[in-house]
Amino acid sequence: MSQIIRDMTEIARCGAQYKADRLSPMGLKGCHASYLTEICAHPGISQDQLAKRICINKSNVARQAATLEEEGFLTRTPSATDKRIMELHPTQKTLDLLPEISSVLKEWETCITGDLTAEELDLMAALVAKMKSRATDYMDGR
């Protein structure tokens, strides 16, 4: 494995632990931040659409959505056009917590990028976007 991939993987693992530590007092797991921020940004998103947007397999999304529903963070309702499709909506509980969740994500970003210059941040953002595009192209082609 290349050093770049190792480093990116390690950063992702550290970020997951950071989110888990900060979100657990809210009753959330670290992985739930990406689910809830997307659901709040796109109320009514289907489980399949969410899986594609956050690059998680459909069965994991279904499992986590069920957990989040049980805990009162979202509702799952069958689509009016296709009862097999489950649409996800944030609850008021989630909407109330969204600023805190967003703050945790911003804190992590600041933690790992705080000593980078504006030019370094711009370059990194462009390079990461390029890599993400290739990664999502792979996922779309599966």
Segments (PLM) and residue ranges:
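Key DNA-contact positions within bacterial/archaeal DNA-binding proteins
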Residues: 31-33, 59
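Residues within helix-turn-helix
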Residues: 47-48, 59, 66, 86
